[in-house]
């Protein structure tokens, strides 16, 4: 039986929305940040409590300003490695928030933190899908480089 190619149609993939692309890019960025912060053996430290674990073993990309601030969702300087305990539960406590603030001031300076605070008050940016896709592609390339550096590729 010959297949009639003229009438045969492939199921088309649904195009992703901008918010879906932003979420995928954010996941990739968090992975990249953990890899970048890890040593050559793949271990990184939580910026708030100091526990050291493998980059993919109960470590997450913690946000200084929460992801609800879309300005910072794809902002690399706002994301750092945190253990799951600090990221999920600890950020609700003043002690962990203060530890993260001290880390940020040591890393970037008080002036930069104030500038980020002013940015957090702005309206959410309108991401263009092609820009987000390109950003994600670049991050995925950086992830490959980091995986190669720690010997996991």
Name the predicted role of every residue range.
Residues 21, 71, 92:
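Conserved aromatic-histidine-acidic binding/catalytic patches
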Residues 76-86, 105-136:
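Short Fe-S-cluster ligation motifs
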Residues 51-54, 79-109:
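Short Cys/His-centered divalent metal-binding micro-motifs
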Residues 45-79:
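Histidine-centered nuclease catalytic patch
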């Amino acid at each position: 039986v010959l297949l009639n190619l003229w009438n045969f149609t492939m199921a088309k993939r649904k195009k992703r929305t901008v918010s879906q692309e932003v979420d995928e890019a954010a996941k990739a960025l968090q992975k990249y940040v953990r890899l970048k912060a890890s040593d050559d053996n793949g271990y990184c430290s939580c910026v708030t409590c100091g526990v050291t674990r493998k980059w993919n073993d109960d470590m997450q990309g913690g946000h200084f300003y929460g992801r609800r601030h879309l300005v910072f969702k794809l902002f690399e300087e706002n994301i750092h490695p945190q253990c799951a305990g600090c990221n999920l539960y600890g950020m609700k406590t003043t002690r962990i928030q203060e530890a993260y603030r001290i880390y940020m001031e040591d890393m970037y300076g008080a002036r930069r933190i104030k500038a980020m605070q002013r940015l957090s008050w702005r309206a959410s940016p309108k991401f263009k899908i092609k820009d987000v896709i390109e950003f994600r592609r670049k991050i995925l390339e950086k992830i490959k480089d980091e995986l190669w550096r720690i010997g996991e590729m």
